[in-house]
Amino acid sequence: MGPSDHLFRREAGRMVATLTRIFGVHNLALAEDVVQDAFCRALEVWKFQGAPGNPSAWLMTTAKNRAVDILRHERRTRSQALEVLSMSKTSVDPE
């Protein structure tokens, strides 16, 4: 088991729990996904830049920022879909 495996085993559960508290239990799958994304990103970035001074904080910040980005995108997409639906209802010719 390498250092990245050890870090994952030590941090992943805690990160998912923290993100679930922040974003709600209804976003559990999102929390799991962004934790995986953060670890994948770490493997890519740290290979070239080296691990940061506080890898746990880096991972949590990366995962939290990714979750916020995804939720914003979903909210924006939902809002745009409702706007299009609203416009199509008002522009429908009754004939």
What is the predicted role of each segment?
Residues 1-18, 23-24, 28-32:
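A short, charge-rich alpha-helical start-of-domain segment used by transcription regulators
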Residues 12, 36, 64:
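ATP/adenylate-binding site constellation spanning eukaryotic-like Ser/Thr protein kinases
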Residues 95:
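Glycine-rich active-site/cofactor-binding loop and its immediate structural neighborhood
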Residues 36-55, 73-75:
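Sigma70-family region 2
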Residues 32-33, 37, 69:
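Acidic active-site catalytic centers that drive phospho-/nucleotidyl reactions
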Residues 70-92:
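Short, basic/polar amphipathic helix motif occurring as a linker/hinge flanking DNA-binding modules
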